[in-house]
Design a protein with these regions (language model features):
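Hydrophobic packing residues in well-ordered alpha-helices of helical domains and bundles
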Residues: 8, 28-31, 57
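Glycine-rich, small/polar surface segments that engage phosphate groups of diverse ligands
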Residues: 34-107
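Generic N-terminal amphipathic, Lys/Arg-enriched alpha-helix
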Residues: 1-23
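A short, well-structured juxtamembrane/interface segment
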Residues: 20-41
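Short, functional N-terminal and low-complexity linear motifs
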Residues: 1-4, 29, 60-66
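Short, structured helix-loop boundary elements
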Residues: 5, 25-28, 91
Length: 108
């Protein structure tokens, strides 16, 4: 390969620079504090997504419950999605589901 930098080398270098120069560390600490406070106050964490992001939301919900001990939920049940979409419109189903299930102290 020699001393030539490859596309991948440059890409990784760019990512490192962007991470170092970003607010990622500060934001991660703030997010961790939010999660800890939610857990201490018996709050829940709701994950939501559309399409493939619904799978990510489902996976994150399990990870946060299992690994962090924070009760986490997602709205990936077909009957809930179709019921709320039918009654309130597809563009409103998540909002309406949160209005029904979210309690004070929960985070989304």
């Amino acid at each position: 390969m020699g001393s030539k930098k490859t596309f991948i080398d440059n890409y990784i270098e760019d990512i490192k620079l962007n991470l170092v120069n970003s607010d990622l560390i500060k934001n991660s600490a703030e997010f961790n504090e939010l999660l800890q406070n939610t857990k201490l106050n018996n709050g829940r964490c709701f994950f939501m997504g559309n399409g493939a992001s619904a799978s990510l939301a489902s996976h994150a919900s399990v990870d946060f419950s299992k690994q962090a001990g924070l009760l986490s939920m997602n709205f990936n049940e077909a009957n809930l999605i179709t019921c709320y979409s039918n009654d309130y419109g597809y563009e409103n189903w998540m909002k309406k589901a949160l209005e029904k299930y979210q309690q004070q102290g929960d985070i989304v």
